[in-house]
């Protein structure tokens, strides 16, 4: 089995022995991408941020900005990965940054560019305004730090980005093209263990739950992983290597949520940001609490089930779930 993802207009195929290697290390040391930077090596500063896009059979696209310093390669399987250096000079994000003089020493700039790019793609995908006000800009930048404290010009760039977006340009075309190339590559390999992410859950050639349990039985010391925000710290800060990884995000049932008049059912591997976005529709008063919960790139990776399993004292969903009379099943 291999890991396959798309970056810089080409497919990267890696052996699963590199599952626990960080995306940052691979991009800089193997792919020659120098725009991603290592600052804190623990997902706090955002200098290493990249934009990741995956096909989503329920919503079309899953777009998120993640910290490459703590992102294991396994979790990038069948994804598109964009770095700041991948954007053309005429892109609205680049134009807005230039016209706003939003870069000072430049070390953090690629991460801010990627946060803007993720917001830009999400807005184009949903057909809405990109970053309508200062509060929205601060939320987009919640996972980025500027040591020069040049936030005023960065916020200006965020608020003016839409003015540089030409209506006759299809900015999502590279996304569709990349996903098509990736899907064709996976199908051409004809590996039954390579599940095309473009197919609906009912189209999967194997039952991912059964397959994951089989792998666990064969590799009893392997660790289950979803968002990998805790695991990433083991790798980057403690230099520990697990005895194999099993990605729970390849199980569709664990990454979706459903709600009806009987309540809400949330998959354990669903990202916290997706869960919070859904909650805010019904309980907007939760916004202040939820936005204090890590930065957006962490929330976009970390899962609800992982948060409960890790029992972290600095990022705890349990009080909220208690208040909502939640149950585990």
State the predicted function of each range:
Residues 51, 231-232, 289-325:
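A gly/ser-rich beta-alpha-beta helix-loop segment of oxidoreductase catalytic cores
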Residues 66-70, 226, 233-258, 267, ...:
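Structural signature of FAD isoalloxazine-binding scaffolds in flavoprotein oxidoreductases
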Residues 79-80, 104-106, 221-223, 243-246, ...:
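Structural motif
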Residues 1-210, 250-254, 258-265, 270-271, ...:
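Signature of N-terminal electron-transfer/Fe-S-associated modules in redox systems
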Residues 209-219:
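A short acidic-Thr-Gly-centered motif at the start of a beta-strand
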Residues 270-300:
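Ligand-binding beta-strand-loop-alpha-helix segment within the catalytic cores
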Residues 147, 224-225:
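Conserved SAM-binding loop
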Residues 154, 230-231:
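Alpha-helix capping/helix-boundary segments
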């Amino acid at each position: 089995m291999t890991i396959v993802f798309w970056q810089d207009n080409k497919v990267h195929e890696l052996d699963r022995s590199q599952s626990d290697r960080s995306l940052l290390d691979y991009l800089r040391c193997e792919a020659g991408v120098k725009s991603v930077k290592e600052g804190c090596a623990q997902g706090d500063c955002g200098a290493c941020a990249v934009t990741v896009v995956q096909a989503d059979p329920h919503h079309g696209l899953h777009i998120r900005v993640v910290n490459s310093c703590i992102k294991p390669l396994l979790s990038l399987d069948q994804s598109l990965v964009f770095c700041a250096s991948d954007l053309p000079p005429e892109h609205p994000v680049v134009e807005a940054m230039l016209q706003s003089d939003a870069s000072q020493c430049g070390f953090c700039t690629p991460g801010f560019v990627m946060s803007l790019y993720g917001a830009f793609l999400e807005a184009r995908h949903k057909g809405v305004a990109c970053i309508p006000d200062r509060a929205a800009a601060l939320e987009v930048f919640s996972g980025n730090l500027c040591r020069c404290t040049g936030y005023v010009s960065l916020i200006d760039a965020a608020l003016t980005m839409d003015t540089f977006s030409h209506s006759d340009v299809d900015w999502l075309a590279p996304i569709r093209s990349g996903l098509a190339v990736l899907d064709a590559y996976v199908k051409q390999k004809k590996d039954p263990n390579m599940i095309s992410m473009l197919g609906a859950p009912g189209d999967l050639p194997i039952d991912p739950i059964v397959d994951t349990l089989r792998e666990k039985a064969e590799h009893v010391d392997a660790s289950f992983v979803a968002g990998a925000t805790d695991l990433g710290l083991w790798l980057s800060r403690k230099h520990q290597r697990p005895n194999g990884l099993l990605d729970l995000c390849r199980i569709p049932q664990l990454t979706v949520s459903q709600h009806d008049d009987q309540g809400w059912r949330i998959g354990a591997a669903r990202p916290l940001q997706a869960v919070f976005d859904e909650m805010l529709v019904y309980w907007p008063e939760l916004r202040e609490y939820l936005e204090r919960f890590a930065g957006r790139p962490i929330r976009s990776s970390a899962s609800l089930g992982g948060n409960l399993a890790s029992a972290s004292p600095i990022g705890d969903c349990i009080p909220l779930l208690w208040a909502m009379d939640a149950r585990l099943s």
